[in-house]
Amino acid sequence: MVAFGKKLKERSIEEWQEYYINYKLMKKKVKQYGPQIEVGSLDRRHVLKDFSRMLDHQIEKIALFMLEQQGLLSSRLQKLREWHDTLQDEPDLSQIAKLREAYRAVGQDLLKLLFFIDMNAIGIRKILKKFDKRFGYRFTNYYVKTRADHPYSQLQQVFRHVGLGAVVGAISRNLHELQNNEGSYLSIYDQPVLPLQDPVVDSIKNAVDRLTHSTNFLNFMAQHALIMQDDEDLLMLPPDEQAEKEEGRYHFMSLLLNLANTFLYMVNTYIIVPTADDYSMSLGAAATVCGVVIGAMAVAQLFSSVYFSAWSNKSYFKPLIFSSIVLFFGNLLYALAYDFNSLALLLIGRLFCGFGSARAVNRRYISDCVPLKIRMQASAGFVSASALGMACGPALAGLLQTDFKIKNVTFNQDTLPGWVMAVAWLLYLVWLAISFREPAREPEEIHTSQESTSEQIFCGEADQDGNIEKGLKKPLLLASEETEHDEEDDGDGSEESSDDSRKPANSFVAAYKLLTPSVKVQLLIYFMLKYAMEILLSESSVVTTYYFGWSMSSVSIFLFCLGLTVLPVNLVVGSYISNMFEDRQILLASEIMVCIGIVLSFHVVIPYTVPQYVISGFIMFVSAEVLEGVNLSLLSRVMSSRLSRGTYNGGLLSTEAGTIARVIADATITLAGFLGQSMLLNVTLLPSLIICVLSILATCYTYNSLY
């Protein structure tokens, strides 16, 4: 793979060559620091100071050139504004056409400047990561924090493209006013809903979107999905080349089929929750065996996530076909277990359903095949489909209140979820076979691991100690064997990449070795919230029947209402709260709220009431939803870039952590059932409380490294 140094040289704008980051010089300087430290000619503080000074100089050069170009663009726009004013008094169609072309020419030059900024931003991120990798020290966070927060920050100029918004606005507004050659002047401010059909403005908007990493609802929802992305090579291409490269891979109907698969699988997961205890008792088992029935699907998913993730390296269509067939038969077995009076058949059916979990394929399709400009929306759609399926599953179960037989086959509230889902998967299979298009793959396509584009520009990789002084007390230079492993050839600037430093992890052990303490804590938090949510949902029918005598319909309504909170809560957090507070602050506050919800759920001395259960359940569930979104947002930033590709990627690790939590939670419910239903609630909540307290302590310990 051609590395960044050569790409920068090939794709830089020739007349602006001297204003780009001198990546080769910076890289060579990093290489020289090693021997100098070994012989004692330089100490650690001097290295950090010297490297910071060099990088400051490079950023200043870039920032000042940006300001100069902004000034030139602004001057041209001012002259065009004067020309525009004269045409308002005496409209001339030919002059209006020329004026539009003049604005488009400015827009094209603005695109060049945005591409210049993009290349330099990538270069700065890469050289910071190279310094961290070579010396085993997380310098990135210290540098970014001290420079970005300064009132006269030049780093902000580069990464936040300060001032360019006014230029973009001027071009967009004037082209919008001139879009009608009849002389009708329409303002984007007065009528913002009016579409502007101009390819230049569309290209500018896409370029700005690539550079902008501000938090909003779609961004928050996209990170909630933890779609691991690897598009740095693509980002460094001009927009027209990006579109050409993406063409042939994206197919709207195929994306829709992946989202439908996500939705149906979540419906399949939760449709049995309200009736699992009743089904278990009808087969002669205890009500608490519902934990095993519900958890069997999660057990199988532990294995299916791995082989589906590996299978998606070669195909997307075949795994989805296999998933649909397995889920069809799984639901068929689940429904037939009633007439065969077989608990074993019931569990086998649920295991089959778990073996059909293709969520890894759904995630992978979005990260690999959906164009950058709509990937955030697609990722948010993945989360929304999951949330909608989670809400619709129990609601659908509540509607299946009937009991009849056709020949010797029973259709009642216990078996109908299986029959309905079997039909749904059969119809989906037909739709899939007709409409899905396998994406085009490049010859010898290699999924290499680079910096994830979902990573916030300002975050870099997390500093494990969050303190520059603490870092200075550690050995700055790693063993020569390790540094040589990551070194790149500087002879001709071609920068051959080290295979080991870029290739994806090839096993769980290799993936685990890439996990920093910050990432481990985030996975622990994910485990905790999934455990707490599974306890709440899976035992709801048993607990509410025992304490309140709720019917299956009442349980369905309760679970449906819980599911409906997912999207509104994420909307509030993604659009408002995350703009007022840091992610790590929201993370810690959400953990505390989950802990409060768990504590309030305990049955201690006083009679257990419906308001106590419902209020504590909503506090726990809503807080866990907020926590999940923020947790995955942070996880996508602090996780190694090598985990953005391959079979054992970050998405798989988080899925496995959550699935293991669900398996243990469901097993806990069944085991606690041996102590009697009166003890079930408190016994299952106690592990949740312990894990939650541990996760809060771990978060406090790594708080300074969560950026």
Curated annotation (Swiss-Prot):
SUPFAM superfamilies: MFS general substrate transporter. It is a multi-pass membrane protein. Residues 481-498 have a biased composition (Acidic residues). Keywords: Membrane, Transmembrane, Transmembrane helix. Residues 481-503 are annotated as: Disordered. It is found in: Membrane. GO terms for cellular component: plant-type vacuole membrane. InterPro entries: MFS, MFS_Domain-Containing_Protein, MFS_trans_sf, SPX_dom, SPXM_SPX_plant. GO terms for molecular function: transmembrane transporter activity. Residues 2-145 form the SPX domain. Its main location: membrane. It comes from the Eukaryota. One of its GO terms (biological process) is phosphate ion transport. The chain crosses the membrane at residues 252-272, 283-303, 320-340, 342-361, 380-400, 416-436, 523-543, 557-577, 586-606, 614-634, 679-699. Belongs to the major facilitator superfamily. This is SPX domain-containing membrane protein At4g11810. It comes from Arabidopsis thaliana. The lineage of its organism: Eukaryota, Viridiplantae, Streptophyta, Embryophyta, Tracheophyta.
